[in-house]
A protein has these predicted regions:
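Short, glycine- and charge-enriched coil/turn segments that flank and shape catalytic ligand pockets
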Residues: 99-100, 134-136, 176, 199-210, ...
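A glycine-rich phosphate-binding loop feature that marks nucleotide/adenosyl-phosphate handling sites
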Residues: 10, 83-88, 249-251, 300, ...
Length: 400
């Protein structure tokens, strides 16, 4: 297993925030990347590679890929005029706007006109649809696959702007340096540059070993970029596609998204101070369903910790250890003895690992956790049914 994560560090939004903070863009992203890595460490989250899109190797490969796509006719220079959302780093047509605002984040858009290089997405639309049809698990969950096909691919793909001239914080197009490579090629390509892809074919061993990736695990709000733009770019570069792209749902606060303006953002370090790392990790995994958005509030978190971790798991561990220390000197005198309640528990214990594994293979983490806690609840019930404290005093049933 090779697990890679990292930070997308270029773009107009970062350039503007760095200016507002009176810092250079590089100093600004260095600081932010440090904070993000600190959060991974805080949450005991391990990874094999933390890639930054300001890494020199990544920048060099992006320039080489851009030039290769241009030279083979997949990219051409033209001019773009439309509406631009800085927050989403995306262009939109008039008809795509929602009540005059960004259709994705609801934020403000402004009229933009600039020279740009464009990627001919439409040249690969039929090939992409064919790939999706022949690989039914390529986009998951199923509802998101249908959304991508029916809402974006089949209506027709517009050519994609892949360079910008209105800001400077980006990777320069080496043969036309007034342009910087836009996020679609810059950020998305980190998945292959991070494991040693080389546009000239001199790949590192890690790329040969780990690509194509078994899984891209991403937020549902960026699924379009990872299931349309990214696969088409790989097709154009003659690189195998990842085996699956999974768009996970959001964790909502109450019924709405977290928003700094609403003051409802829940921060990981605050949660760790309140509940501890392991409890927070459990909460994040359990409250994130497979397809629907999850809901997280402080009341839900307290209730979940009390009911699951304290009453079910904690109670089982406490009762088991206490009775082990109290009775028979902690020794099982006859492991083969059984009673009327044993077989049901044995069957459940034997079947649970496969159920957990099957659910994890399909990324149904919440269901896997529920499988485990079904077993824990049955163990607690077994203790109530068999009453070891009574058996220990009954000489005839002492082996039980």
């Amino acid at each position: 297993v090779y697990f890679m994560t990292g930070t997308d560090e270029h773009g107009q939004k970062i350039e503007e925030k760095a200016l507002a903070a009176n810092k250079t863009p590089q100093a600004f992203v260095d600081e932010v990347a440090g904070v993000i890595r600190g959060l991974f460490d805080l949450m005991n989250t391990s990874y094999d590679k933390f890639i930054r899109t300001t890494d020199p190797y990544h920048e060099l490969q992006v320039q080489k890929m851009f030039k290769k796509l241009y030279e083979q006719g997949d990219i051409y220079k033209s001019e773009y005029e439309g509406w631009y959302c800085t927050a989403c780093e995306s262009f939109y047509t008039e008809t795509q706007l929602k009540d005059g605002a960004c259709p994705d984040c609801g934020g403000p858009v402004h009229k933009a006109k600039e020279e740009s290089y464009f990627f001919k997405l439409s040249n690969y639309a039929d090939r992409l649809i064919k790939h999706i049809e022949e690989h039914p698990d390529f986009i998951q969950p199923e509802s998101r696959k249908n959304e991508m096909i029916n809402n974006f691919i089949k209506p027709g793909l517009q050519d994609l702007a892949v360079s910008r001239t209105s800001f400077k914080w980006g990777i320069p197009v080496d043969f036309d340096p007034k342009h910087v490579v836009y996020v679609w090629i810059d950020a998305l390509s980190n998945y292959i540059t991070g494991i040693g892809y080389d546009a000239d074919g001199n790949h590192e061993e890690r790329f040969k070993e780990f690509w194509p990736a078994d899984l891209h695990l991403i937020g549902k709000d960026i699924l379009r970029f990872h299931t349309i733009y990214w696969p088409i770019m790989l097709m154009a570069l003659d690189i195998p596609l990842p085996k699956q792209v999974f768009g996970h749902p959001w964790l909502l606060v109450g019924e709405g998204k977290m928003s700094k303006s609403k003051g409802n953002v829940i921060y990981a370090d605050d949660l760790v101070k309140l509940f501890g790392v392991d409890a927070v990790r459990y909460l994040m995994l359990h409250e994130m369903p497979f397809a629907q958005d999850g809901t997280l509030t402080y009341d839900i978190m307290v209730e979940r910790i009390n009911s699951d971790l304290a009453n079910i798991l904690g109670n089982l561990v406490n009762r088991t250890l206490a009775m082990t220390n109290k009775y028979n000197g902690g020794i099982v005198t006859n492991a083969k003895v059984s009673g009327e309640f044993d077989q049901e528990l044995i069957d459940l214990a034997l079947s649970t690992p496969k159920k957990v594994s099957d659910h994890m293979d399909r990324l149904r983490v919440q269901d896997s956790i529920d499988d485990i806690f079904d077993l824990l609840k049955r163990c607690n019930k077994y203790i109530d049914e068999t009453a070891p404290w009574a058996l220990a005093k009954d000489e005839a049933n002492k082996d039980r």
